[in-house]
A protein has these predicted regions:
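Conserved N-terminal subdomain of the carbohydrate kinase-like
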Residues: 2-8, 20-110
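Short pre-catalytic strand/loop immediately N-terminal to key active-site residues, enriched for Gly-Thr
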Residues: 5, 9-15, 194-208
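Glycine- and other small-residue-rich loops at beta-strand/loop junctions that grip anionic moieties
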Residues: 12, 78-79, 113, 207
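Short, small-residue alpha-helix embedded
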Residues: 21, 26, 143-144, 204-228
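Phosphate-handling active-site elements
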Residues: 30-35, 194-195, 221-235
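Short glycine-enriched, charge-decorated loop/helix-capping segments at active-site entrances
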Residues: 48-54, 113-118, 147-151, 203
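Charged C-terminal helix
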Residues: 54, 70, 229-259
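Conserved phosphate/ATP/ADP-binding segment of small-molecule kinases
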Residues: 118-194
Length: 259
């Protein structure tokens, strides 16, 4: 039943809504066995993040080595890579793995606040984009990666071209950060194939972990053997249904219901 294996590399969300926890729930919903490598531990709830602690270098590398020594992992995704050191160490390992790599560049919050220092963003560009089979930035992250201010559909397409120029094989820019772009994402690959992808917009405030869920679902579908664009389309539908089943557990935005 769970013959395929997907790996998530990212941060632990103590509130259970995003990060590793959302990724593993997504993998389980897709009937894919989920493995995890923790890069940082957070203390958070629905309204605040009160602490973020990176794991030690050896702890990170041993987690990766131990998993790959025994499991035939079919696809992996990255989430929160907290600093330049973690990005460098992760990229050095990922460069040796000949499997699908989905890079979710968690750099900016949904409201536009930067999570990473410039040195870490530069490490993303130099080390992770060239080995990415797909990068899944939101509008703000695409801005940082491409250096282009994004205000329109045309800006999104130009930003995608810049990101492809940095070495990524494909990019999916999530348009939800722009007015009138809810549920609209832009896909571009190295061969010039481009698609605007549309889904129904689910009007809910319970969206915590939606970006993590999307990249995890893409990773899960790739592990199951689907082509990349098919995986993206299926993942978008999965997120739509999960948002429709979202629920409230605290004072702030609640998590998705992964079904």
């Amino acid at each position: 039943m769970y013959s395929k294996i997907a790996l998530t590399i990212g941060g632990s969300d103590s509130g259970g809504g995003a990060g590793i926890q959302a990724d593993l729930r997504t993998f389980m919903a897709l009937k894919v066995h989920g493995c995890s490598v923790i890069t940082c531990i957070t203390a958070q709830n629905s309204i605040d993040v009160t602490c973020v602690e990176p794991v030690e270098k050896n702890t990170l590398l041993i987690q990766l080595d131990t998993l790959f020594a025994d499991f035939g992992i079919d696809a992996l995704k990255t989430g929160m890579l907290l600093n330049e050191r973690i990005i460098i160490d992760t990229a050095s390992k990922l460069n040796t793995y000949k499997i699908t790599k989905i890079i979710d560049p968690v750099m900016v919050t949904r409201t536009g606040s930067k999570l990473l220092e410039d040195s870490a963003i530069n490490a993303y560009k130099k080390l992770l984009l060239p080995i990415a089979d797909l990068v899944t930035p939101n509008i703000y992250e695409a801005n940082l990666l491409s250096g282009l201010e994004i205000r329109s559909k045309e800006d999104i397409e130009n930003s995608a071209r810049k990101i492809i120029g940095l070495g990524a094989k494909a990019v999916l820019i999530k348009g939800g950060g722009l007015k009138d772009m809810k549920g609209k994402d832009f896909f571009l690959d190295l061969n010039g194939r481009k698609e605007w992808l549309f889904n129904n917009f689910i009007n809910t405030k319970n969206t915590h972990g939606s970006g993590c869920t999307l990249s995890a679902a893409i990773c899960g579908y790739k592990a199951l053997g689907f082509e990349l664009l098919d995986s993206i389309q299926k993942a978008k539908l999965f997120v739509e249904k999960s948002l429709d089943n979202s629920y409230k557990i605290g004072s702030g935005p609640g998590p998705l219901g992964h079904h």
